[in-house]
């Protein structure tokens, strides 16, 4: 946010965020698929560019414990404030929007929500934005300059007075309850897409927009697999390298935004994947706040770039190769000629793989392996299940080739970028 003018209203900034920010644990391995919303810790999220966080708490006597539903997240609000304030000390040009909500019934004998909150706020008063510090007309939409170095509470609890911005006053899309089947998943996507388009048009009307990419099947997810990770990714498993889940093999005009392969087979589209692609197409110039489960660097950076700035990461094109949609004649796996990655820029921390398909295909449906051409011996696989915007460890070799592609109907190009700080 350091490169954004201080006079910019919060409503005019595109802000990456997380839903269920501290939801890192299930009560046991049995419910983790349902309960968990994130893999990154709070500090990792902040350092990745997240600036909206969603804090759910339970009152325990005179303190807040972090909860998701009835599941304890093995942290307390003091931990949250310690990490957030340290981040703001290290990055004083930033601001953190923090939704604060009572998640479950309090422990017997606990203080009121407001009493507990004030205990935390009073100790750390200089790091909480005070709505009384700006004119009444600006209290629901302050400028970035007013809030730099501060936590802005998006108040989702009742109290005698307002300690931040009224959460219920935001323009919110939060269709979080999702049934089974492609129609339900697609309805969630349309809600996201419509809200993005509305935000893009109305971002300067003084209203802060919040778009939840998150969703769940709730308890029914144990039967229908509509877990938060599936809603986010549309994939067959929680593994980030897994393939998109197939809906049906025959061609159809239904679910038109969902990805298809060359035979017309239709796959589920994850909200994060579809959202990232829409943001990268260029029609959306402003997103408001996006709260996602399991956001990756592609989504986070796509939101940040809408502000006309970039994250601290740099992408340097180091190689590219054209591949056929299936193995070359006489080849078992190989679908391209050899290409090399033989020189990595200083500071390279990983590689990013970008798929540029033909007009008939979608990058999100294509995946492939990368193999090494071994002159005297059996070719080996360096990377498996590479998909659009996958990130991998960086290894050099002069004889890589694309192998075993799926999901493409014709030639596609693979661009390889070195990611540096």
What annotation goes with each model-predicted range?
Residues 393-407, 412:
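Noncatalytic modules at the cell exterior or secretory-pathway interfaces
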Residues 382-394:
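Beta-sandwich interaction modules
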Residues 359-377:
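Short, surface-exposed beta-strand/strand-loop-strand elements in extracellular ectodomains
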Residues 411-421:
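Short, structured beta-strand segments at or near domain termini in extracellular proteins/domains
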Residues 122, 128-280:
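Surface-exposed substrate-engagement region within the catalytic domains
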């Amino acid at each position: 946010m350091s490169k954004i003018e201080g006079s910019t209203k919060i409503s005019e900034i595109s802000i990456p965020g997380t839903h269920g920010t501290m939801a890192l644990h299930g009560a046991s391995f049995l419910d983790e698929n349902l309960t968990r919303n994130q893999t990154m810790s709070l500090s990792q999220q902040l350092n990745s560019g997240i600036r909206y966080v969603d804090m759910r708490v339970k009152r325990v006597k005179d303190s807040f414990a972090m909860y998701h539903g009835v599941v304890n997240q093995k942290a307390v609000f003091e931990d949250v404030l310690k990490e957030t304030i340290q981040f703001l000390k290290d990055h004083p040009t930033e601001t953190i929007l923090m939704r604060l909500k009572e998640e479950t019934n309090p422990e017997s004998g606990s203080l009121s929500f407001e009493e507990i909150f004030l205990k935390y706020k009073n100790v750390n008063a200089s790091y909480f934005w005070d709505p009384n510090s700006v004119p009444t007309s600006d209290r629901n939409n302050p400028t970035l300059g007013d809030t730099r170095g501060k936590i802005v509470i998006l108040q989702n609890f009742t109290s005698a007075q307002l300690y931040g911005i009224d959460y219920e006053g935001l323009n919110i899309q939060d269709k979080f309850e999702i049934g089974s089947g492609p129609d339900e998943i697609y309805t969630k996507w349309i809600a996201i897409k419509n809200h993005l388009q509305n935000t893009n048009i109305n971002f300067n009307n003084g209203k802060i927009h919040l778009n939840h990419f998150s969703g769940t099947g709730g308890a029914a997810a144990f039967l229908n697999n509509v877990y938060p990770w599936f809603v986010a990714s549309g994939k067959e498993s929680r593994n980030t390298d897994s393939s998109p889940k197939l809906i049906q093999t025959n061609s159809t005009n239904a679910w038109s935004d969902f990805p298809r392969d060359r035979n017309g087979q239709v796959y589920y589209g994850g909200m994060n994947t579809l959202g990232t692609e829409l943001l990268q197409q260029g029609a959306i110039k402003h997103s408001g706040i996006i709260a996602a489960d399991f956001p990756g660097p592609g989504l986070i950076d796509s939101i940040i770039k809408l502000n006309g700035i970039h994250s601290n990461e740099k992408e340097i094109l180091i190689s590219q190769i054209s591949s056929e949609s299936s193995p070359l004649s006489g080849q078992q796996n190989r679908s391209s000629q050899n290409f090399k990655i033989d020189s990595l820029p200083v500071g390279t921390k990983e590689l990013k793989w970008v798929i540029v398909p033909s007009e008939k295909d979608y990058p999100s449906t294509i995946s492939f392996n990368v193999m090494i051409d071994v002159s005297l011996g059996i070719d080996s696989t360096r990377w498996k299940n590479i998909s659009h915007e996958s990130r991998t460890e960086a290894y050099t070799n002069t004889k890589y080739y694309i192998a075993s592609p799926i999901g493409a109907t014709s030639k596609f190009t693979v661009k390889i970028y070195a990611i540096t700080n």
